[in-house]
Amino acid sequence: MVAGIAGGTRVTPASTTPVTFSLKYRPINYGADTGAFVINVTQGGQPLDYVVALQGRGDMTGLNTDTFRQDSKPKADILLVIDDSGSMGDKQTALAQNMNSFLQYATSNQVDFHIGVTNTEQSSTTAALAGTLHASATGTKILRPTTPNLQVEFADLVNVGTSGYDESCMAPATKALTAPYITDPTKNAGFLRQDAVLAVVCVTDAPDQAPQAPAFYLNQLLNIKGAQRAGMFTYNVVGPFLPSAPSGCSYDGTNNTRHDFMVSQTQGVKEEICTPNWAVALERIGKNAFGYRTNFFLNARPDL
């Protein structure tokens, strides 16, 4: 039904007065309906038809409204998975020395953060620690904005040692953030918060050597927040992304695209482990890991 104008109405040529068409639709059954509104005109002596496609649907649910609120003081849970192989000593030192750059965004935006650290080794002397949050010399496992001597504690935690061998961030990250480790009071209980964004930050100079395909770990990590809140999880990597290591730096193997897959699937950030400017690299990682939510997921698929 067209309201506001009668059928067969003619618009005077050269008129500058706009004509408004208001269409009303009322379904008579369930399901999709289509139609068209046709405007017949004559331009330059030639008849033309302008067709406006119409779509409608009859359903039982009616209008669905989703409401999203951005936290004024966002929360972020950050798991650092740090390569503890023999070639990582200088990289761990650089990470510790540039803590302020990593935390710059969180500090300036008053982010309520949890930071935990675990290592990559899966099969030798440090394998028992992989997936378990490390404790500092003072017994601190979870760093918070209120943690005393935060810089000292951070430097202590990220110095995970260099006695490891096989290197994987995906496997220990998944172990750390899922049951039974995440609910075990002797391991990682208290780290995850339901209303906080979650970020894994992998720091390694090697391709990921986890035994399963990346999609296996991705699905488990995404399930932590759930399909409707997938935008609350990111996977970020400081790793070996150049064809070969530049002079003065070293890789423990070249990139095999497994890191790239995890980053791209979660809208994470990747930075070069052999960067000449750790401050800038960690600042970019920090902005993404600690940042406000940028993706909001609807509860139902819209009719578009």
What are these model-predicted stretches?
Residues 55-304:
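Divalent cation-coordinating acidic motifs and surrounding scaffolds
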Residues 1-64:
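Feature for long, exposed domains in two main contexts
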